[in-house]
Design a protein with these regions (language model features):
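Active-site mouth of glycoside hydrolases
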Residues: 12-202
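Ligand-binding face of N-terminal immunoglobulin V-set domains in extracellular IgSF glycoproteins
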Residues: 1-8
């Protein structure tokens, strides 16, 4: 049971392409993108997330790109606050800035059930999307990326398809959502251009 009301004056709807070369909100208000990227701000501590939101609030940025999956890189070697699947990650206790390149999506020691999504992971991302929405900031989701030590970049086509279906079903209703298929798609050695074309048509 719910009640439908007119949109508030701050709610201009989702951003669309306008007159081929421009962007505008659904109600026709022009949108001029001033974006930034904070890859896994959403998977940090509550304190870091609050700091990020406060920084954004006091900036000119009106769009931020960030990941659904955790990211493995030399400035981000810690474990995320949660994982997208039920299971356990590879032991990262011996991970250093000197050896981090030895860890890849093919690293042994990960045990995930790719048929069971960790619901709390996605619920938390939804809260981040809503916090951005309430600040008038577009949430540009990077759905896949190759910077990985957990095996998420190595999923099969069937596992990818289930993941895409789930992510779209969860997040597509939010008016501030944008979709980035992937960062550095060409670094996924086992995926073809045809695979990416298929994802783009979803």
């Amino acid at each position: 049971n719910f009640k439908v009301t007119p949109a508030s004056s701050e709610n201009h709807g989702p951003v669309r392409v306008a007159n081929t070369w421009h962007f505008a909100y659904e109600d026709g208000t022009p949108y001029y993108s001033i974006g930034t990227t904070c890859y896994v701000w959403d998977l940090q501590s509550d304190e870091r997330i609050a700091q990020t939101l406060e920084t954004l609030k006091n900036s000119a940025f009106n769009k931020i790109r960030f990941c659904v999956f955790p990211k493995h890189y030399d400035y981000n070697l810690g474990e995320p606050r949660s994982y997208p699947y039920e299971g356990t990650p590879v032991d990262s206790s011996v991970l250093t800035k000197e050896n981090f390149l030895e860890y890849t999506g093919k690293t042994e020691g990960n045990h995930w059930d790719f048929t069971r999504f960790h619901v709390e992971h996605f619920q938390h991302i939804e809260k981040c999307i809503l916090a951005l929405r309430d600040m008038g900031i577009e949430a540009d989701l990077i759905v896949m990326h190759p910077y990985d030590r957990w095996g998420f970049s190595q999923m099969t086509i069937e596992q990818d398809a289930l993941y895409w279906k789930y992510v779209i079903a969860r997040f597509a209703a939010y008016r501030n959502i944008w979709w980035s298929l992937a960062n550095e798609y060409d670094l996924f050695e086992h995926k073809t251009v045809e695979d990416w074309e298929g994802y783009a048509k979803i």
